[in-house]
């Protein structure tokens, strides 16, 4: 295999710290696997090599790619040896093909030992794993942890669900809240923050502390740990037991870390301890692709690596073998607007292709229709569905595209779970209002809307499965002001009855005051009310396409069935389908044709991004999206969203589009 000079410098590096800055499509995985091969060829004990990645899938893929390389090398060696024997039998002279596979004619004791085994067999003893799996292995060895003592994700969710059921805390979207709390606790542990000074992003501090302390108590009483505890405990173990640290330092002489830009503080501290005293630490990453700050990733760690490890050799893998010249130049113009980064000169290996296409559409419906039509045109021109991807800033924005692809009968797969808009609690509230306006008297519908906005209704007032307004008034007969509220609700429902779905949604939000309820709930959850308004806006936009509530409700049911069908088909990995993905989930992937949609302010950069560091992270995320494309790149924005004007993302202009 041919390597460029930068790749050769990286894979031939032997001792001491090295930082490999790997631009998009620069062949970093190839460099890592070939460096492992070179270390083994040099006689390094395979059990002393540790390769760390961030996901189990990445670790598995890295190991498989290395073993595949090793098998190929073993086969080449075998063929060379057979050729040498034939040459000797026919009296031929020794040639370069006869040289020992692992290096010089006199490899030394360890090299001679290595020559006696296959590269694949040696490679099977190299350790590949995630931070969590490696640290758990260390803790299991030190503390004799029994199998199954790591708390599962489902066990976590069940604990928090039980807590909410038994507390006075009310949340609308239980699954979303629990997921947010789990991530927040992980962040607090990973950053080793003091709860006394921590300001929760999801709920009032007293509730977060109760959730955190209760979860911690569950772990203690059950004798379990979570992934974040592994990092903390491993750090404490190495700090307190220098003898144990020395044993692991002696074992792992060479440490390679992939995607180093995603490392967090605690992971870095443990790896630094483990790499001592030789500091044979080989890190590979791209600070321009650091997009997980919300999980605790700190790109500044990579930026400060050379200061922490004096004498570090740095090499830039600056040749992009993936994308056309136009795509490389467009993405580079964008990322150069970031101030806190390594300066890089990136060059395309490929020549010119088609210009990057940027278009602005009137509204999201027009945007998604055109993208769907373009996808079909690409397929008609000979592209496989699987060669095409549509990328979004968030999964919530992918629902409309999924609906359009269903309508055009275009097969697709989801790299993220698309939230079903119609199963959102706001949708359920709006549907309940409309059901009652249409004549439903089911108690479950009244339970949903009775205090949204707050009318001070008690659940005890709805004491029968079928609700009667007369009975409700009777319950409050000694409170005139409550009877007045009941009459107001009746009048609102009568006013809604003849309205088309979109008019009914707007009436509920403005005339009834549902938006006021959303504001108060957002304040409790430490959210921006705009996040909830956006969901209500999407529902209004959907409702506008239907003449009656019955039609809208039937559409929602069909959409839910289609989503279930798509999720079931996700197991069929070989099926030819268009990819719908968030920008985060697309990292590390590539497609001949890529559509980056919704390139508008408030979406990318996200409206939550306020600080300069947040904007730089959003720019890196957009950069990741652009650099997924091999041949054709389309970027799309809209002029208007939910009947309000919206600006094109600043990143579009920065990229020169």
Roles of regions detected by a PLM:
Residues 391-450:
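Long, highly charged, low-complexity intrinsically disordered interaction regions
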Residues 20, 24-32, 46, 310-313, ...:
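Helicase P-loop NTPase motor core
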Residues 1-146, 246, 329-332, 627:
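P-loop NTPase Walker
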Residues 1-12, 16-20, 50, 58, ...:
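Conserved helicase NTPase motor core
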Residues 127-130, 229, 233, 576-583:
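Conserved two-lobed SF2 helicase motor
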Residues 98, 153-223:
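Coupling/switch/interface segments within P-loop NTPase motor domains and analogous charged loops
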């Amino acid at each position: 295999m041919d390597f460029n000079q930068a790749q050769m410098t990286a894979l031939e590096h032997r001792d001491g710290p090295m930082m490999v800055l790997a631009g998009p499509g620069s062949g970093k995985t190839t460099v890592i696997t070939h460096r492992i091969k070179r270390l083994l060829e040099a006689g390094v004990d395979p059990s002393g090599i540790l390769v760390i990645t961030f996901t189990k899938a990445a670790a598995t893929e890295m190991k498989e790619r290395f073993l595949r390389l090793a098998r190929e090398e073993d086969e080449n060696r075998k063929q060379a040896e057979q050729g040498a024997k034939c040459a000797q039998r026919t009296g031929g002279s020794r040639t370069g093909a006869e040289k020992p596979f692992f290096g010089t004619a006199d490899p030394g004791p360890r090299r001679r030992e290595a020559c006696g085994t296959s590269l694949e067999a040696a490679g099977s003893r190299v350790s590949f794993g995630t931070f969590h799996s490696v640290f758990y292995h260390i803790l299991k060895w030190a503390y004799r942890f029994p199998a199954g003592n790591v708390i599962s994700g489902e066990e976590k969710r069940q604990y928090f669900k039980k807590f909410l059921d038994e507390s006075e805390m009310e949340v609308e979207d239980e699954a979303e809240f629990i997921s947010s709390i789990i991530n927040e606790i992980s962040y607090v542990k990973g950053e080793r923050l003091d709860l006394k000074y921590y300001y929760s992003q999801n709920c009032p501090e007293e509730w977060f502390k109760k959730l955190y302390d209760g979860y911690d108590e569950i772990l203690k009483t059950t004798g379990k740990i979570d992934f974040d505890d592994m990092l903390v405990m491993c750090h404490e173990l190495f700090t307190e037991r220098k003898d144990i640290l020395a044993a692991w330092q002696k074992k792992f002489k060479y440490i390679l870390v992939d995607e180093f830009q995603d490392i967090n503080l605690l992971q870095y501290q443990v790896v630094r301890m483990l790499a001592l005293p030789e500091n044979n630490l080989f890190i590979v990453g791209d600070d321009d692709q650091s997009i997980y700050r919300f999980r605790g990733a700190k790109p500044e760690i990579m930026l400060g690596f050379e200061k922490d490890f004096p004498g570090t050799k740095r090499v830039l893998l600056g040749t992009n073998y993936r994308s056309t010249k136009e795509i490389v130049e467009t993405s580079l113009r964008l990322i150069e607007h970031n101030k806190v980064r390594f300066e890089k000169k990136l060059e395309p290996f490929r020549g010119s292709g088609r210009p990057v296409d940027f278009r602005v559409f009137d509204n999201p419906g027009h945007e998604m229709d055109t993208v769907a039509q373009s996808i079909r045109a690409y397929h008609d021109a000979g592209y496989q569905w699987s060669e095409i991807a549509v990328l979004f800033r968030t999964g919530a924005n992918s629902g409309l595209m999924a609906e359009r692809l269903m309508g055009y009968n275009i097969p697709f797969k989801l790299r993220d779970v698309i939230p079903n808009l119609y199963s959102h609690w706001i949708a359920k509230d709006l549907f309940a209002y409309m059901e009652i306006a249409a004549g439903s008297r089911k108690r479950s519908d009244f339970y949903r809307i009775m205090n949204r906005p707050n009318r001070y209704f008690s659940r005890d007032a709805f004491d029968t499965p079928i609700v009667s307004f007369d009975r409700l008034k009777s319950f409050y007969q000694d409170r005139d002001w409550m009877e007045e509220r009941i009459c107001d609700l009746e009048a609102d429902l009568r006013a809604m009855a003849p309205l088309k779905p979109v008019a009914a949604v707007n009436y509920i939000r403005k005339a009834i005051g549902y938006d006021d309820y959303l504001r108060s709930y957002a304040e409790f959850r430490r959210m921006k009310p705009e996040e909830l308004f956006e969901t209500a806006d999407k529902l209004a936009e959907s409702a506008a396409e239907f003449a009656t509530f019955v039609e809208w409700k039937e559409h929602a049911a069909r959409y839910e069935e289609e989503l279930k069908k798509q999720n079931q088909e996700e197991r069929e990995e070989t099926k030819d389908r268009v990819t719908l993905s968030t920008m985060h989930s697309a990292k590390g992937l590539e497609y001949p044709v890529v559509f980056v949609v919704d390139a508008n302010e408030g979406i990318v950069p996200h409206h939550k991004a306020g600080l300069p560091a947040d904007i730089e992270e959003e720019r890196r995320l957009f950069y990741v999206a652009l650099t997924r494309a091999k041949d054709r790149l389309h970027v799309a924005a809209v002029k208007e969203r939910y009947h309000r004007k919206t600006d094109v993302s600043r990143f579009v202009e920065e990229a020169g589009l």
